[in-house]
From Swiss-Prot:
Main location: cytoplasm
Gene Ontology molecular function: glycerol-3-phosphate dehydrogenase [NAD(P)+] activity; NAD binding
Protein name: Glycerol-3-phosphate dehydrogenase [NAD(P)+]
PANTHER family: GLYCEROL-3-PHOSPHATE DEHYDROGENASE, GLYCEROL-3-PHOSPHATE DEHYDROGENASE [NAD(+)] 2, CHLOROPLASTIC
The keyword Amino-acid biosynthesis is annotated on this UniProt entry: no
Protein origin, superkingdom: Bacteria
Organism expressing this protein natively: Aromatoleum aromaticum (strain DSM 19018 / LMG 30748 / EbN1) (Azoarcus sp. (strain EbN1))
UniProt-annotated location(s): Cytoplasm
Reactions this protein catalyses: sn-glycerol 3-phosphate + NAD(+) = dihydroxyacetone phosphate + NADH + H(+); sn-glycerol 3-phosphate + NADP(+) = dihydroxyacetone phosphate + NADPH + H(+)
Family indicated by similarity: Belongs to the NAD-dependent glycerol-3-phosphate dehydrogenase family.
Residues reported to bind sn-glycerol 3-phosphate: K103, G132, S134, K187, D240, S250, R251, N252
Amino acid sequence: MRIAVFGAGAWGTALALAFSARHDVVLWGRDAGHIDTLAATRHNERYLPGVPFPEELALTADFAAAARAADLHLVVTPLAGLRAAVGELNTLQPDTPLIWACKGLEAGTGKLPHEIVAEELGPAARCGVLTGPSFAAEVARAMPTAVTLAATDPAFARRWVPALHQPRLRIYANSDLVGAEIGGAIKNVLAIAAGVSDGMGFGLNARAALITRGLAEIARLAEALGGRPETLMGLAGMGDLILTCTGDLSRNRRVGLALAQGKTLAEILGELGHVAEGVSTAREVVKLAARHDVEMPLCEAVDTLLHDARLGPREVVEQLLSREPRRE
C-alpha cells in the first residue's frame, strides 16, 4: 500500500518512519530546501535529530505527485494548514481516503478538525483522525505507543486500523470523532497550566488536581458537543492529557514552564521554534465553552495568562484558588 504523509515536521516524520516499516511511504514537505536536506542527509535534524531514515522512505516537495500516487492521504500539518491541505487534496484526488493527525480548534472559527474536513470534502468523505498519547521522538524510535483512530464510519476503522497497526504502534478504533478531537485539543491548553504549576513549584498534589479537574472540563465540553464521556477515559482523553501534562517533551508544557519563569509569550514562542497548539486553542476553547454554557475555569485561566498582559502567573493562580468550593 502507498501512503502519502503531508507535513515534514516532527510528527509527520515520525509517522512516516513508523508506517514505512510496512508500506511504501512518501513524505511531503512544503519547503523544498528542507526536503533536499532530508534527502541528502537521510535525517530530519531540525525536528527529530538522531533518527536515521530507512532507504525505503521517499521524500518530495511535489504535493500533486505525492497525492496522486497514494492509496491513503495522511495530513500531519499544524492545524492552521489543515484546511488548505485538504482542499488541495480534494481537487487532486477527491476519492482517496484521508486521515489527519493534527489537534486543536481552528483560529477564528473554533471548528474542530473533522468540521474543517467536512466543509472541504463534504459529509460523506471517507476519513478519520489519528490521535492519542504520542511523542514524535518516541514513535520515531519505535518505542511502544498506543493511539486511537476515530471515524464515524465503522467500515473506515475496520479497513485502516489493521492496515496501520503495528506491535509498537498499537492503534485502537473509536467512532466518537467529537470526543477524540476535543480531548486532543484541550489537553494542550491544560498542559500549559501544568507547566505553570510545576514551574512555580506547586508540587505533585497540585499537578494531580489540575489533571483531574482538567479532565472534567474536557468531558463537560465534549458531552455538550455530542461526544461520549467514555472516550475521555481512554487514549484520546485521559491518556493524552496525562502524557502532555507530565512529559517534558511536550511543547505546551514547556510554554507553561517558561511563563512561570516570567518570560513573555513572544519570547517563549521565538525560542520554541515549533508550533504549540495550546496557545491558539485556549482562546477558541473559552469561546466555544461560552457558546454552550460550559464552565471551564482552568482553560479560562490559561487564556487569561496568555492574552492579558496585566496579570502574571501568580495573580492568575490566586484567582483560581480563591474560587468558591462546590460539588465535585
